[in-house]
Amino acid sequence: MGVLYHGSSVSGLKKLEPRKSTHGTYVYATKYEELAVLFMRKCGDDLTYTLYRDNQDGPWKLIERVPNAFETMYSNESSLYTVPDTTFKDIHTGFSELVSTSEVETLSEKRISNVYDKIKELESSSKVELYKFPNRPNVIPNDDTDLVVSQVKQSERTHKKLTKSSFKRLLFLHPNALESINKELSKIGKKPFDINDIVDIFEEFLVRQMLDPSREQFIESSYLMISKNYPSLEPVIKSKLDILNSSQNEKISFILDTIYKRFKDFPKEKFDDIKNYYLNSNKSYEDICKEINNQVVRISMMESLISKDIPSDVLSNSIVFIGPMGSLKSSTSSVMSSILNMPKVSLDDRETLKEYYDKRSEFESFKDFEFYLTSSVLTSLKIPAIIDFGAGHSVYEDPIMFYEFQKLISRFSNVVYMIPSLDKEESIQILNERLLERNSNESTESFDANRHFINMSCNEEVSTIREVTSRKDIQEICDEIISKIQNKEYKNLYIEEEQHKI
């Protein structure tokens, strides 16, 4: 039986369990003690260091790609474990690592109080060659263009679309690669970065660091890199850093103002309400940051969901039905599907949409799940369809969530708001009567929910067509909707209906 090495920040482990990583769910180990130590970093990635060796018998070359990266990455304690090699195999990860799909018993543990000091010991014994910034082997270009090439290749390898955002962190840590990055952006038809963008990107990553201190962003390294390559930016970057020494409310204002820049068309008054809520909160700074960070994570999730490409004919020719319970959405959408010979998709159909509903437990709140369901279904459409929303799928109390939903649904040309009457109280009465006809034991919760759906303005704001359904049969409703779509009457529909109401 041979022995392998594994590094972990956790001490006292009697067995190592497989963990999901880049290559799959494995326990990782290596034949080389020095390599296990080099993997003990607490943070950092390919943008902060490079690791390789020229041949199997040569020393590992560890290159610091940004100032002070080694101190940041390795200023931690860790444990070096030995494990038997019996269940491990080589899947060619790119390093001299072996993997095991099953849990592994540990044979021994050696606690290392400072990983960086241990690496220096390995350097003195010629097992590792350290290159402190800006020193580097000749094979690594001084302008860091190799990192730009790696970013492009990674996008190709993972089949992820290359966007301007793909290069943000690269530019944040390696502003000297600006010209090379812009060359790649020109290839994909994107507007180039300028030096002012570097300031905005620095601000963005500074806020990330403030919101979640446990995730190291290498702020100090970025500051030094920007100052070195663009001395004219040093004063403004320094002023951003100074916010770390300001008062709690000043830091919170800075965080929120920076986040708001991402949402230029978000209603200013609603943003001010959110800002005032946090500025007047009795919660600790740490709790406020945690709460805001959770919102940012949710926003990132929503942005990722709604940014997917949707075929233009789907956006132009699909018909989306929204409205409260009992508004005849399901009946009308079924008949419309038959008339137009278009597939119908119901967001309440748990069986057909099982792959989405099975993920319900992954979301903290039901509204988070509803947003995921709605956006996933809409962005997965390949051909025009009739989409039947559930009553709550288009109503969001959270202003940011509604803002994101609005950005998605506004891409669709035909969004039909089904409503019994232009008078809200009359609508509520008719809707509840319909619910009772459907189920005489209908709970008051449904009635209360309908009142909420009617009083919220969400459906009115996102719809392009408003169809009043009282005293009309389904065929008549369908004919009216088709006529409005064909004649584009819906552009002035709200004005005409309000005049008719008067």
Language-model features, listed with the residues they occupy:
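Glycine-rich phosphate-binding loop used to anchor ATP phosphates in small-molecule kinases
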Residues: S365-I409
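NTP-dependent small-molecule kinase module
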Residues: N276, N280-D313, M456-I502
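Conserved NAD+-utilizing ADP-ribose enzyme module
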Residues: H23, K42-D212, E216, S222-I226, ...
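ADP-ribose/NAD+-binding catalytic cleft of ART/PARP-like enzymes
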Residues: M1-G24, F39-K42
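Conserved substrate/cofactor phosphate-moiety recognition/catalytic segment
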Residues: S338-F371
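P-loop (Walker A) phosphate-binding loop of NTP-binding proteins
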Residues: P324
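A glycine- and Lys/Arg-enriched "phosphate-lid" helix/loop adjacent to the NTP-binding pocket
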Residues: N55, S410-C458
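Walker A/P-loop
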Residues: S330
